[in-house]
């Protein structure tokens, strides 16, 4: 029986007449001894390929490295080693297309798109095809599939990756309910964040998030979390929970947006300065301190993960003025921890300091 030649789609321009299976074109060829395993369909004769991945969700941080575990084995075990093909890809979520991450045959591999230069297979031990992702980005969280292909036999497993982070509501300087879905995506990105998923909002509600303005989520639904039922928020008779308006038109309907930011690689700090500053002066002061003016998502992450606690209102990059409170302070607003907001004052006013961000 001829050996099976397996080549990624993008590497074989003349392959349109070949059978397509599991993201690859297959060709019966005896000419390439390096890519075949020499067994063909023998694997079907009483031997089962098993792929093992963890059932629990993996949690990590933006900028970190993480290993997505994946191992395979044969039942019953085989004496002679076999060369397999491995494919990792990120599953579709909320209408986004699937993303190829990496394909490998033996020691040869190829990564794709934004994953190039950031991913590789561990392969430290026999039958270990775990994927390492370096310099994690906000958009990397989600579900990944590990597929092992031996001839025409294939098995796969799922690994779910979640980033630890903080959800915060974001409102336009022009008031509530100003963003369509795409504008919500843009403003979250401008604040070092992404649009939050329902799971992230629900987890934030479990931790105490209470917000009465409805906002976009990643799946284009509009929802809001309520801990203390009250009249403007669905009425006092409803139980606490996450209220939903359901799916809304991505271009026509307008709401606020819930953003999600993860822990920082750098540091947010209140700049000690002899004078209060205008917004322009605040930006320049951070630059003079070898830093940049902090974004809203960075301030929330510093409050959540680094315990930033300061009762001084300061400018942020979007022109808002905020300050983070972890412990109650006299003359510092409500006793509950949170990031307080002064809204969007006149950029020329000299009433505030500034929060800066410096990368490590």
UniProtKB/Swiss-Prot annotation:
Keywords of this entry: Disulfide bond, Extracellular matrix, Hyaluronic acid, Immunoglobulin domain, Repeat, Secreted, Signal
One Pfam short name: Xlink
Predominant location category: secreted
Subcellular localization(s) per the UniProt record: Secreted, Extracellular space, Extracellular matrix
Signal peptide feature range: 1-17
GO CC terms, sorted: extracellular space; perineuronal net; synapse
Domain Ig-like V-type: residue ranges: 48-164
Tissue distribution: Widely expressed with highest levels in spleen and placenta.
Domain Link intervals: 166-261, 266-358
SUPFAM superfamilies documented for this protein: C-type lectin-like, Immunoglobulin
GO MF annotation list: hyaluronic acid binding
PROSITE patterns: IG_LIKE, LINK_1, LINK_2
Example GO biological process: central nervous system development
Gene3D superfamilies from the UniProt entry: Immunoglobulins, Mannose-Binding Protein A, subunit A
CDD domains named among the record's database cross-references: Ig_LP_like (cd05877), Link_domain_HAPLN_module_1 (cd03518), Link_domain_HAPLN_module_2 (cd03519)
InterPro entries for the chain: C-type_lectin-like/link_sf, CTDL_fold, Hyaluronan_bind_Proteoglycan, Ig-like_dom, Ig-like_dom_sf, Ig-like_fold, Ig_sub, Ig_V-set
Cysteines engaged in disulfide bonds, as pairs: 70-146, 188-259, 212-233, 286-356, 311-332
Protein purpose: May function in hyaluronic acid binding.
Family: Belongs to the HAPLN family.
Protein's name in the database: Hyaluronan and proteoglycan link protein 3
């Amino acid at each position: 029986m001829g050996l099976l030649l397996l080549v990624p789609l993008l590497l074989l321009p003349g392959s349109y007449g070949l059978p397509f299976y599991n993201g690859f074109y297959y060709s019966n060829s005896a000419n390439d001894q390096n890519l075949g395993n020499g067994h063909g369909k023998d694997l079907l004769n009483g031997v089962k390929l098993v792929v093992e991945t963890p059932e629990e969700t993996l949690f990590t941080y933006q900028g970190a490295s993480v290993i997505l575990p994946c191992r395979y084995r044969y039942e019953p075990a085989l004496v002679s080693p076999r060369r397999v093909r491995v494919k990792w890809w990120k599953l579709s979520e909320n209408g986004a297309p699937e993303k190829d991450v990496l394909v490998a045959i033996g020691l040869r591999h190829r990564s794709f798109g934004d994953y190039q230069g950031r991913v590789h297979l561990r392969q430290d031990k026999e039958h270990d095809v775990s994927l390492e992702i370096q310099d994690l980005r906000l958009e990397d969280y989600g579900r990944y599939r590990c597929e092992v292909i031996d001839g025409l036999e294939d098995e796969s497993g799922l690994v779910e990756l979640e980033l630890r982070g903080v959800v915060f509501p974001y409102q336009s300087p022009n008031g509530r309910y100003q963003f369509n879905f795409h504008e919500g995506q843009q403003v979250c990105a401008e604040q070092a964040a992404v649009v939050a998923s329902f799971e992230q909002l629900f987890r934030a509600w479990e931790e105490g998030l209470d917000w009465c303005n409805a906002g976009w989520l990643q799946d284009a639904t509009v929802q809001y979390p309520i801990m203390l039922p009250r009249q403007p928020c669905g009425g006092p008779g409803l139980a606490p929970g996450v209220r939903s308006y359901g799916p809304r038109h991505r271009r026509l309907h307008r709401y606020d947006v819930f953003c999600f930011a993860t822990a920082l690689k750098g540091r947010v700090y209140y700049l000690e300065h002899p004078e209060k500053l205008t917004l322009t002066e605040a930006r320049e002061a951070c630059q003079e301190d070898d830093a940049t003016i902090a974004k809203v998502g960075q301030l929330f992450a510093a409050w959540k993960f680094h315990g930033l606690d300061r009762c001084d209102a300061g400018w942020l990059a979007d022109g808002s003025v905020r300050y983070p409170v972890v412990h109650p302070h006299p003359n510092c607003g409500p006793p509950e921890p949170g990031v307080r907001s002064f809204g969007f004052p006149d950029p020329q006013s000299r009433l505030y300091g500034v929060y800066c961000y410096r990368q490590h």
